[in-house]
């Protein structure tokens, strides 16, 4: 028994020790001898585990393993991360019976999909007299404060959002580092751990019946999670940013999209909270100011800088728009989403899209890369999403969102749903504007002129010369035999006549727009510049 109680640090997102206000709150009484219990609970939903593929689950488990190793290293083995499987309130109740909990501290999960879980925890704490502490650190600003500052309603345009956060002020700097080396930690008895469903060590994906699929052999990049990896990648990313700033341009990943090189994105680490968004934001801004100052000393003026973290601000906007909208991930009941009459769900079309069997090499390569690695360049995300919806198959964005949430490492509920609504012209876009449709063939020729990407992820086409690799349907029967690629046998026929589909879809969008005498309240860009700057918000 511990007479003064113990403090729980409940990890959900925010899988890190740096910039962790919840950790600081849990350590406030350490000088009084109140020990710490760091926990993560597999409850079937937290950290996006309701529907999760192998790569996403492995990334999460990597992150938990890294946390456990850091805790043990900093405390010479006295501290560790307790990983449970079960219902959080039942676990907390049982812990309280054994060690009398004083506080439960957690990073605020602002999305409405976590409301039921967190409200149950609050009710339990009120019942048992436990203090429940939530701290904002997964976003730059508290979305609830943004809405309150905007008069109690979410800002319908990005410009309104910017105006609101300017009133609030710049985002807080990262919190000070927590000193855990001298903290006291609870050691749970083996019988109690077993009773509570506590793992002896961080489990593997197979424990949850999640297995690597048959696309794994295509993987070029093996993403690993964890704070240690995230901070190392941040240093590499800042070198890229410095080089770009010194050359006078910003957002280098957008200025020169390269679908073949190893990505330098931090988005997966931001999604799981292995890297603090505030640490990233201020690291980039401080770097730009230093580069700007050094240039000024040399008599060189570097202009701009307003957009260097623009993608992070869009991330904030999507979080804010979702916070009071439990139907944000669907059309029905979603007040900001236009109800577009998509075609009846066609499982054959959807499955061919999911598996990369559409007959369009760039689409197929991208969808297979997603399954193999859990990753896609932002340009490819836009392309496959447009192809599924208004730019091709005319299927609803909802199945696409579900697929991305399962397999994409950095997919979180708010940002991923917001991106799908934008790309499908359902929200955050000019009203039902289908004028900008990416042609996957033309894009492939521009981004992959030699066919390197296609040969890697669509090996059926590896023998094709570059003149045909993006349009294999142009091969004659003799050429198909020569290059050992029979269309319809080794590689599928095209799923649709794309040019006809695009024209039909544009007509449908135009007809729907004309039928709306009074357009519904619609999240939209404030001006053309926002449309120009928008890319799938992934490659932060």
Curated annotation (Swiss-Prot):
Cysteines joined through disulfide linkages: none
Q: Which GO terms describe its biological process?
A: circadian regulation of gene expression; entrainment of circadian clock by photoperiod; negative regulation of DNA-templated transcription; regulation of circadian rhythm
Q: Which InterPro entries match?
A: Crypto/Photolyase_FAD-like_sf (IPR036134), Crypto/Photolyase_N_sf (IPR036155), Cryptochr/Photolyase_FAD-bd (IPR005101), Cryptochrome/DNA_photolyase_1 (IPR002081), DNA_photolyase_N (IPR006050), Rossmann-like_a/b/a_fold (IPR014729)
Q: Could you tell me what this protein is called?
A: Cryptochrome-1
An example Gene Ontology CC term for this record: perinuclear region of cytoplasm
Supply the source organism for this entry. Answer: Drosophila pseudoobscura pseudoobscura (Fruit fly)
Where's it mainly located? cytoplasm
Q: How is the cofactor bound?
A: Binds 1 FAD per subunit.
Q: What does this protein do?
A: Blue light-dependent regulator that is the input of the circadian feedback loop. Has no photolyase activity for cyclobutane pyrimidine dimers or 6-4 photoproducts. Regulation of expression by light suggests a role in photoreception for locomotor activity rhythms. Light induces the degradation of cry, likely due to conformational change in the photoreceptor leading to targeting to the proteasome. Under circadian regulation, expression is influenced by the clock pacemaker genes period, timeless, Clock and cycle. Binding to tim irreversibly commits tim to proteasomal degradation.
- Alphabetized UniProt keyword annotations: Biological rhythms, Chromophore, Cytoplasm, FAD, Flavoprotein, Nucleotide-binding, Nucleus, Photoreceptor protein, Receptor, Repressor, Sensory transduction, Transcription, Transcription regulation
- An example Pfam family from this entry, by short name, is DNA_photolyase
